[in-house]
Amino acid sequence: MTEQESPAVISGAARSAGSAGSAASAGSAGSAGSAGSAGSAGSAGSAGSAASVANDRTEQDADAIVVGAGPAGSAAAFYLAQAGLDVLLLEKAAFPREKVCGDGLTPRAVKCLAKMGVPTSENDGWLRNKGLRIIGSGVRIEVPWPELSNYPGYGLVHTRLGFDEAVARTAERAGARLLERTAVTGPVLDERSGRIVGVTAVRQDGSTPREERARVYRARLVIAADGNSSRLSVAMGLRKRDDRPMGVAVRTYYTSPRHDDDYLEAWLDLWDGDRLLPGYGWIFGVGDGTSNVGLGLLNTSDAFQNTDYRALLGRWLAGMPRDWGFTEENRTQPVRGAALPMGFNRTPHYTRGMLLVGDAGGMVNPFNGEGIAYAMEAGEIAAEVIAQALTKRSAAASERLLLGYPQILRNAYGGYYTLGRVFVRAIGHPELMKFATRHGLPHPVVMRFAMKLLANLTEPRGGDAADRVINALSKMAPGA
């Protein structure tokens, strides 16, 4: 690629969403690393003097800083390290740490883990599943994961307590410098350009007074992977979009004989009194003697703001067979909740030296509430863009590549997320939801199509009629 080429050119290498980062590792890893070292931390794209910067650099300086070691941040750090870059991965908690999640992983997420080499054997605490069992309107149907050339034919379940650490340690083994108990408190901005050139953070080691532990970490580029609230994004002036869907999920764990179920189970009949709610309940066996049980709802219903979700979960579970074990005495954890930021609800995904990935950029799939796969894919794409940008000899050429990052994301997910927003609005109408479950669930062909659409699992080229229809609709829909 020449210095004058458009940043959109790299989208071909970055896309085919599951193979997002081929160019990151291919993008001249050695030269990417040296170019990263060559640039002054305070000047986003200047070539500078490699020797001077190398001599001046401290352990608190890096080519790139990633804020947050969830799936998005750890994936980004992994691919940055693989590209030969010096990357700091800052995590406010200490592993292992808890996150609210259903713990179920589709084949799309499994592919991301396999690509990084994350160990996922049963001995490491991972439980395989065959597909999705859907229950609604008196119908019960099992839909296996589709057989596709570009995805594995199985899903996984693993608690987030262990999942996030497994991915973060994989990034660490690749060369990322992981700093736990390091809470980022704000951006460091260049006074002249307003660009982010680092972050301030507090090391929560408990050994000295708080004010003496505040430190400055500097880098040419920063990735915000700090979750739904993304304080770093807010400090940089980015707010959530009100025209994007939002979900909420609550979950807990029970000891249960269903802990080793080889299907993920989704219940579509979520009633609050006489109101059918837009969302679903889930029962995912974890394989360790417990099941993850929870529910997720969308903000397209009038009930969104005035529903007690914990009470709703209790009422739903009260109707389950008692021998499944979902009783108060078998509950092993508190009921916890979290927001699900969907369909690119915070934009732009690049501004003044900062790239957004995962929940910080609102990358949850509106169709099914899945966030991990898209977080990890976006982390890979962001790393690829950074690795290529840091090889450029001029600030202008580097910036052109970085400015192309949001368009790469729109090309990959924009049309599909637009379809998802239409879907979210539609199921906000109870009568339409009833019609869809009553007339769709009894038909296996319809449900196989729905599985591919909702999980975003298709052959990228060719495939069956369902693949071609879904791919065509995603391409025709305007970008998110």
What are these regions (language model features)?
Residues F78-C101:
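Glycine-rich FAD pyrophosphate-binding loop
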Residues A94-M116:
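Conserved N-terminal glycine-rich FAD pyrophosphate-binding loop of Rossmann-like flavoproteins
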Residues A14-S52:
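Long, intrinsically disordered low-complexity tandem-repeat segments
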Residues A387-A480:
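C-terminal helical "tail/cap" subdomain of flavin- and related membrane-associated enzymes
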